[in-house]
Design a protein with these regions (language model features):
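Non-catalytic accessory regions flanking glycosidase/transglycosidase catalytic cores in CAZymes
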Residues: 1-253, 258-402
């Protein structure tokens, strides 16, 4: 993208925070660990143990007889997790065990209550887990510091921060687990102090804000499709208080609500039909998305802009290859008058990773690959992009591409 559009502003989507993805955002790897799995110790059966008794932040408070729990810190040898010295720190009294699976290995170099120092050879085909087999006093505040960062006050890994240098905007659709989100009210969202941010409820927005402040990047945030009015207002207030006022917020209601593979599309269709917006379910969904977007814009702005005008871009979105649908979204109840931009996702170059070209792709030079992308972009998207741009411009909106 940077090579194809070196003069224009280019943002980036982040990967979902999980234990198996390629990015390494945190110096404390436990922030992206998997949620607790409870086991029956004897006879062993994966994931069939009693429910884990935790506090409000997810830390185990006690274990039943014959029960143990574990969390996968990273899986499948994520390449950004280096071999080396890891320091594991925790509060409480009990038995905490680091375990390397697959072809990985670890050596315990030092161990005392609350601290385990290990030399870890990261498994390329297995797991690195933290296992708790005994709790005398609740085990809390587990941290797994990557090499070179023991007891660091840093939140984000410097390599991760450097990877964002070329971009001017960060889109947090994946960090927020926007697609199929179960979040309805503010307290449904992952707590900032939760033991892991890798939950189906998404990373807490304060981490997103902190990342934007540290990198001086604009923030593109997606509001969960079922979020109530108070959630949206809290989000606006949080951004007003915590986000650098020189940065811009791109505000979008959910993600691809026109796309029926996602629960947000089904939700919008149900709501649209219930409100009698249109007799056809898909059309009712487009119209509901349009009017709920305007409501979200107004709710967020009522607190975000309470003390004066801030940098806010209100984003309506649609389908890149269907300009007619996009016009329905913009024009319903004059929604375009409450927006600043219209966004589409004009994918290009995806075919270079299909079964026919995968064996050849490693032989492509960078200039050749970029030339193929340019051809694919022009041949597949020029007509639609021009139509979408013209339709947006006629309504006073800029056209954005979000993926």
């Amino acid at each position: 993208l940077l090579a194809l559009a070196p003069q224009g502003p280019v943002g980036v989507n982040l990967e979902t925070v999980t234990d198996w993805h390629q990015q390494t955002p945190f110096v404390d790897a436990f922030k992206s660990s998997r949620e607790w799995v409870s086991h029956q110790a004897s006879p062993f059966s994966w994931g069939t143990g009693p429910a884990v008794i935790t506090d409000e932040y997810g830390w185990p408070q006690s274990l039943q007889s014959n029960q143990w729990v574990e969390s996968i810190v990273f899986a499948d040898g994520s390449p950004n997790y280096p071999d080396g010295i890891y320091n594991i720190r925790y509060d409480g009294i009990g038995t905490v065990e680091p375990i390397a699976g697959g072809n990985g290995s670890l050596t315990i170099l030092q161990q005392s209550q609350g601290h385990i120092k290990i030399n870890l050879q990261v498994p390329s085909d297995g797991l690195f887990t933290i296992r708790i087999t005994d709790i005398v006093q609740p085990i809390e505040n587990i941290r797994v510091y990557l090499p070179g960062f023991d007891n660091s006050s840093r939140i984000f890994h410097p390599n991760f921060l450097r990877s964002l240098d070329p971009f001017d905007t960060i889109r947090f659709m994946n960090w927020g687990r926007t697609n199929d989100s179960p979040v309805i009210n503010w307290y449904d969202a992952t707590n900032f102090y939760n033991y892991t941010q890798a939950t189906e409820r998404g990373v807490h927005p304060l981490y997103m804000i902190d990342l934007c402040n540290k990198t001086r990047k604009n923030m593109w945030i997606c509001v969960p499709h079922m979020a109530d009015d108070l959630y949206v207002q809290y989000l606006g207030l949080l951004c007003r208080i915590a986000l650098d006022p020189d940065l811009t917020v791109y505000l979008e209601y959910s993600n691809e609500v026109w796309n029926s593979q996602f629960q947000q599309a089904q939700y919008a269709q149900t709501q649209g039909l219930a409100l009698g917006l249109h007799p056809q379910s898909w059309h009712a969904g487009w119209l509901y998305y349009s009017q709920r977007s305007v409501e979200v814009f107004n709710l967020f702005s009522s607190l975000y802009n309470q003390l004066g005008t801030r940098n806010l871009v209100r984003v309506l979105a649609g389908q890149s290859v269907n300009p007619w649908v996009n016009k329905q979204i913009m024009d319903w109840q004059n929604a375009y008058q409450s927006a600043d931009a219209f966004a589409v996702a004009p994918y290009f170059g995806g075919g270079f990773g299909n079964l026919n070209t995968t064996p050849l792709a490693p032989t492509f030079s960078v200039p050749y690959l970029l030339s193929l992308c340019q051809i694919n972009l022009v041949s597949n998207h020029t007509v639609y992009t021009r139509q979408n741009a013209a339709n947006a411009q006629q309504r006073g909106l800029q056209l954005l591409a979000y993926e």
